[in-house]
């Protein structure tokens, strides 16, 4: 199994990994198109991690890739909910199906008692999802174990009950597409 990925940093030679990639719209659109057409993906799910908002990258993805659905990933801060609203409205205007909303950094669980501590507030993502009749698929905690596995390149070893709803929604989307 495993995760396959491609990114702009793989396309540019002789650069330090901390150097920014500064591209304008037409170049971004071309790179997105190239990722889609020139890479032999052979995957059941293709995740496209995009910058927040409604700029060139989401526009290029929505226009050039036949999408079965998108998952809007957000965090609980008030300002972020405005960005999510824009992304959802953009997808709706472009007839891109939305599978649901996933809230990242929802809370941290106390290691001693398990109590959820909402560092960035609570309920904003759920409210935004409800306004658009979308399911809130998962609320991902800030989890040091998950962070350690990601850093070690072993994300597939992670198990978290909060992930099940999102996985179920993806499976339903795949079945509808077949």
Name what the model sees in each region.
Residues 13-26, 34-60:
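Switch II (G3) loop of P-loop NTPases
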Residues 1-12:
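Single conserved hydrophobic/aromatic residue that forms the stacking wall/gate
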Residues 38-40, 58-78:
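Inter-motif core of Ras-like GTPase G domains
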Residues 24-31, 53-57, 79-83, 94, ...:
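Helical mechanochemical/support elements of P-loop NTPase systems and associated helical scaffolds
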